[in-house]
Amino acid sequence: MGMSQNNSTLVAPQPKGIIDPATGKPVGSNDAYFTEINDELADKGFLVTSTDELITWARTGSLMWMQFGLACCAVEGLMQASGPRYDMERFGVAPRASPRQSDVMIVAGTLTNKMAPALRKVYDQMPEPRYVISMGSCANGGGYYHYSYAVVRGCDRVVPVDIYVPGCPPTAEALLYGVLLLQKKIRRTGTIER
C-alpha cells in the first residue's frame, strides 16, 4: 500500500507539497471543482487568497504613525501632509499619539545627543513590526548642524531606518512618496522580520 519494492528495497512514494513547483500554484488549483467554486465565489464578493497575503495587505493599508518631532520639519512637513490637500489618511496611514499603538515612527528634526536615549526608548515601546521614516536633512544626517558637538549625525545611528525622505524641509509630496515606498517595502518583504 503506497510502498513499491525495488530490488528488495522499500521505496515510499514522493511526498506532494502544497505548492506545485512547476506552476507556483497550489496543487489541485487547476481542478475543475476548485475552479467552479472560485467562479461561484467571485461574483458574491469573496476573495480566495493565502493568509500571508491577507495579513500583508491589511498591514500596508492600516499603518499608524507617530511623530518624533524635534524641529521645524515636524511642524511644516507633517502638518501639510496631514492637511486636506494631501490627506495621508486616504493612503491608509493615520496618526496616533502613543508609541504602543504605532507601527511607524516619523523622526523629523535635529537629533541631539541628549534626545538620542529618548528616541531609542520610544522606539523600543513600539510593537513589532515597527518601521522608521527619517524625514528631512537634520534627521537623515545632521543637516545644518552636522558639525556641532551636540548633534547625532543621523537618527540611523540610534534606531534602524527603513525610509529616508530628503529635503529641508521635505515637501508633502516627498513624505507621501516615502510612505508609499514603505507600504511597497512591507508588501515585498511580507514578514515581520526585516
UniProtKB/Swiss-Prot annotation:
[4Fe-4S] cluster binds at residues 72-73, 138, 168. GO terms for biological process: aerobic respiration; electron transport coupled proton transport. Binds 1 [4Fe-4S] cluster. Residues 1-22 are annotated as: Disordered. It comes from the Bacteria. Its cofactor is [4Fe-4S] cluster. It holds the Pfam family Oxidored_q6. The keyword Hydrolase does not apply. Its EC number is 7.1.1.-. Residues 1-11 have a biased composition (Polar residues). It catalyses: a quinone + NADH + 5 H(+)(in) = a quinol + NAD(+) + 4 H(+)(out). It is found in: Cell inner membrane. GO terms for cellular component: plasma membrane; respiratory chain complex I. NCBIfam families: nuoB_fam (TIGR01957), PRK06411.1 (NF005012). This is NADH-quinone oxidoreductase subunit B. The gene is nuoB.
